[in-house]
């Protein structure tokens, strides 16, 4: 069995401590803990406190979730409440299916 697992680096861009920001973070943490236990790094960036980071990463709306690693970079803007849409939108669901299939090949 292959014990190596990818580590996912994600950035969540929010605008302050608004209900949408809080909901997006809570939903995302639930998804990540269920699907990627311990194999992810999540950085939350408040664009009101760090507008230069939003500008550098070309963030135009919040909440925005970006998968930075592994490549390619993928972004989801807006509602993060649909687990499957989040995973598919970031190519995370496909990666996990591929990893599980390759583990079964042994």
UniProtKB/Swiss-Prot annotation:
Family annotation (InterPro entries): Circ_KaiB, KaiB-like, KaiB_domain, Thioredoxin-like_sf
GO biological process, one term: circadian rhythm
Keywords tagged on the record: Biological rhythms
HAMAP family: KaiB (MF_01835)
Record function comment: Key component of the KaiABC oscillator complex, which constitutes the main circadian regulator in cyanobacteria. Complex composition changes during the circadian cycle to control KaiC phosphorylation. KaiA stimulates KaiC autophosphorylation, while KaiB sequesters KaiA, leading to KaiC autodephosphorylation. Phospho-Ser-431 KaiC accumulation triggers binding of KaiB to form the KaiB(6):KaiC(6) complex, leading to changes in output regulators CikA and SasA. KaiB switches to a thioredoxin-like fold (KaiB(fs)) when bound to KaiC. A metamorphic protein which reversibly switches between an inactive tetrameric fold and a rare, thioredoxin-like monomeric fold (KaiB(fs)). KaiB(fs) binds phospho-KaiC, KaiA and CikA. KaiA and CikA compete for binding to KaiB(fs), and KaiB(fs) and SasA compete for binding to KaiC, thus the clock oscillator and output signal pathway are tightly coupled.
Similarity comment text for this entry: Belongs to the KaiB family.
Identification of the protein by name: Circadian clock oscillator protein KaiB
């Amino acid at each position: 069995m292959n014990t190596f697992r990818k580590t996912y680096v994600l950035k969540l861009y929010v605008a302050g401590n608004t209900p949408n920001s809080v909901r997006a973070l809570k939903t995302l943490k639930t998804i990540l803990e269920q699907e990627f236990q311990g194999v992810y790094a999540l950085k939350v960036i408040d664009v009101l406190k760090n507008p230069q980071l939003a500008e550098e990463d070309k963030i135009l709306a919040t909440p925005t979730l970006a998968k930075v690693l592994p490549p390619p970079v993928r972004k989801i803007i807006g509602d993060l409440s649909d687990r499957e849409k989040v995973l598919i939108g970031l190519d995370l669901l496909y990666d996990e299916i591929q990893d599980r299939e390759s583990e079964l090949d042994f």
